[in-house]
């Protein structure tokens, strides 16, 4: 019973880390979106903390896939006039958007992993 309680506590602490990771990504983007390189630098620091915590080659793949696919989707949407960004560097999107999409992908992947560990499946 004590083992289960300790494991449950660990999983909830992991979920808390994931939420802090996502909230920091959002707050840094809101605060520094006009200072593109500062935003990129701070978001990369958050990304590195996430990757160090999760330590998985799959997380790196998820980040790269999310960064590329998410940003590509935004470029297509901008190209068709769906929306625009207040600042843009390449193809209508700011450089920090790559990191934001990658962080979002890692966050959703890790939340799915934690929910699976807690028994929320099928």
Where in the sequence are the language-model features?
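Aromatic-rich, lipid-facing transmembrane alpha helices and their immediate juxtamembrane interface loops
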Residues: 2-122
């Amino acid at each position: 019973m004590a083992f289960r309680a300790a494991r449950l506590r660990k999983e909830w602490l992991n979920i808390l880390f994931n939420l802090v990771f996502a909230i920091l990504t959002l707050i840094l983007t809101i605060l520094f979106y006009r200072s593109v390189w500062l935003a990129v630098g701070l978001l990369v620091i958050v990304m590195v903390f996430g990757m160090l915590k999760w330590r998985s080659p799959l997380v790196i793949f998820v980040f790269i896939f999310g960064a590329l696919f998410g940003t590509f989707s935004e470029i297509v949407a901008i190209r068709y006039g769906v929306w625009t960004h207040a600042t843009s560097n390449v193809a209508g999107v700011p450089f920090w958007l790559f990191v934001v999409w990658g962080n979002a992908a890692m966050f959703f992947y890790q939340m799915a992993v934690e929910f699976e560990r807690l028994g929320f499946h099928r």
